[in-house]
Curated annotation (Swiss-Prot):
The gene is metG. It holds the Pfam family Anticodon_1. This is Methionine--tRNA ligase. CDD domains: Anticodon_Ia_Met. It is an enzyme of class 6 (ligase). Zn(2+) binds at C143, C146, C156, C159. It comes from Buchnera aphidicola subsp. Baizongia pistaciae (strain Bp). It is found in: Cytoplasm. PROSITE patterns: AA_TRNA_LIGASE_I (PS00178). GO terms for cellular component: cytosol. A motif ('HIGH' region) lies at residues 12-22. One of its GO terms (biological process) is methionyl-tRNA aminoacylation. A motif ('KMSKS' region) lies at residues 329-333. Binds 1 zinc ion per subunit. InterPro entries: aa-tRNA-synth_I_CS, Anticodon_Met, M/V/L/I-tRNA-synth_anticd-bd, Met-tRNA_ligase_1, Met-tRNA_synth, Methionyl/Leucyl_tRNA_Synth, MetRS_core, MetRS_Zn.
Length: 545
């Protein structure tokens, strides 16, 4: 049955270029979307730049630019990188938009009218040297929960807890290096504890991975707290209605950007109805891909806002781990990262897509990028086992049979084994168990190569009586290659495109069970090349940008 699906990725922050850690999520979601589209579902894929906050304001000031000009340049940079990695968003937008301003204020008025917003004076961290209230990411100290040092002012990367910056132990301003003072300010709070019963029921409904539910249970036991949705001037963002010096916290307007980005897409597509996807009891499905560091926001704050404002909640949230290199999490704010554009200068997008897919599962585990393992994985799996399968037999079809496949499969049992394996791969891709799907693909590629080794088609060319057998064997191998590449099409779109040109067909999931017979193929050309040692030097320590 055809489903109508909306898929989102968490929004990259618009204060610098994307690194390969960002692309773990974009690639994971893009593979899943491409797979679902190949299965015949209607899928809409959206994302946007998270374009508000003090860090953006300060960065633009340092560059002597307006925040609007700065985020415009960053937007173009992000879009360019995403396109080079074949991330096919139907709409990539920005939270600094008229639609987002509209929905943010509309939702705020609904919350306020329902008595879910309260105001009170609180103490905030203030840098007396720079004369500015410190945003969460511009103050560091020890986590108030687990006491880990060097944590930001909103969230601990070790224990996953969220907290107020004033709770940090021994806070230090990242702007001046001084200890900030406490300064009183009027702030606006959303009544998150009111939704605890709903949230407990919702998180147990299968919308999240088991390990996430376990973590949420810990947070429930600690007790939910009111959520500060306001920030003080100076700030780059949307004003709270009626207050010129108060702004909405970026973590309120950013998730609402999922709604506004889809609304903007609807204005571009006449056949797309906004409420079909976002009304309370929508029959459409909503899948959201996020990193483990923003689970608190997406599994507690976000569904509560949706419930209160009468919008639908996600069908499922896929949570992934971080990307590490040399055991360290890639971090744009810390400057230890490999920029996406640097990857493209040295390598190709398919190679990173495949490498991530070979490691991604439904478990929330960090993925280590190891240069030598990466080189081995691509050369061994993709070049030696998959691409080589086509190159081993294609010349026989090109030279002896006028580029035309035969009328029969030599080993029907082997072909059927590949076809029946599709159900397992479908299940793995559906559940984001990409590593298991890739393992099955490589296992079957090994079997296909063993078939070639056993049949030795090169020996059959010596006697014309073997012509039909040779023809059938090569046809069988290219059909097995076709099935392998159909499975890999969502993972490696460039290789799939080259394979389609060679096979002279469009790789369709529905056609896996139908042998390609009496069919003209093209002259074989190298579908991709091996990766050389010199190409991975930028992945080694001391070469990061």
């Amino acid at each position: 049955m055809k489903k109508r699906i909306l898929v989102t990725c968490a929004f990259p922050y618009a204060n610098g270029s994307l690194h390969i850690g960002h692309f773990l999520e974009h690639i994971q979601a893009d593979i899943w979307v491409r797979y679902k589209k190949m299965r015949g579902h209607e899928v809409w894929f959206i994302c946007a730049d998270d374009a508000h906050g003090t860090p953006i304001m300060l960065k633009s000031q340092s560059l002597k630019m307006s925040p609007e000009s700065f985020i415009s340049d960053i937007y173009k940079d992000h879009v360019n990188d995403l396109e080079k990695f074949n991330i096919n968003y139907d709409n990539y937008y920005s939270t600094h938009s008229s639609e987002n301003s509209y929905f943010l204020k509309k939702i705020y008025h609904i919350l306020d009218k329902k008595g879910l917003i309260q105001t009170r004076n609180i103490f905030q961290l203030f840098d007396n040297t720079k004369r500015v209230f410190l945003p969460d990411r511009f103050v560091k100290g020890a986590c108030p929960i687990c006491h880990t040092k060097d944590q930001y002012g909103d969230h601990c990367e070790v224990c996953g807890s969220s907290y107020s910056a004033v709770e940090l132990i021994k806070p230090v301003s990242m702007l001046s290096g001084n200890c900030p003072i406490l300064k009183k300010s009027l702030h606006f709070f959303f009544n998150l504890p009111y939704f605890e019963s709903m949230l407990r029921s919702w998180v147990m409904s299968g919308v999240l991975q088991a390990s996430v539910v376990k973590k949420l249970d810990e947070w429930f036991k600690l007790g939910l707290r009111e959520w500060d949705i306001s920030r003080d001037s100076p700030y780059f963002g949307f004003n709270i209605p009626g207050f010129l010096d108060k702004y909405f916290y970026v973590w309120l307007d950013a998730p609402i950007g999922y709604i506004s980005t889809f609304k903007n897409l609807c204005t571009q597509r006449n056949n797309l109805n906004f409420l079909d996807f976002w009304k309370k009891n929508s029959e459409c499905e909503l899948y959201q891909f996020i990193g483990k560091d923003i689970v608190y926001f997406h599994s507690l704050f976000w569904p509560s806002i949706l419930e209160a404002s009468n919008f639908r909640k996600p069908t499922k949230i896929f949570v992934h781990g971080h990307v590490t290199i040399n055991g360290l999490k890639l971090s744009k704010s810390r400057g230890d990262c490999i920029l996406a554009k640097n990857w493209i200068k040295n390598l190709d997008s398919d190679s990173l897509r495949y490498y991530y897919a070979s490691k991604l599962s439904s478990k929330i585990q960090d993925i280590e990028v190891n240069a030598k393992h990466f080189l081995y994985k691509i050369n061994s799996d993709v070049v030696n086992k998959i691409v080589n399968l086509a190159s081993r037999v294609s010349s026989f079809i090109n030279i002896y049979f006028n580029n035309e496949l035969s009328s029969r499969i030599d080993d029907l049992a082997l072909y059927k084994r590949f076809v029946t394996s599709s159900s397992y791969i479908e299940k793995m891709l559906e559940n984001c168990e990409f590593n298991s799907a890739i393992s099955m693909v490589i296992s079957l590629a090994d079997i296909a190569n063993s078939y070639v080794d056993n049949k030795k088609p090169w020996n059959l060319t010596k006697n014309i009586k073997n012509s039909n057998t040779l023809h059938d064997i090569c046809t069988t191998v290219l059909n097995l290659f076709r099935i392998l590449m159909t499975w890999l099409k969502p993972v490696m779109p460039d290789l799939a495109k080259n394979s389609e040109k060679f096979l002279n067909i469009k790789l369709e999931w529905a056609n896996i069970c139908i042998p390609l017979l009496n069919h003209k193929i093209s002259i074989f050309k190298a579908l991709r090349h091996r990766i050389e040692d010199k190409q991975i030097k930028f992945l080694l320590p001391n070469n990061f940008e």
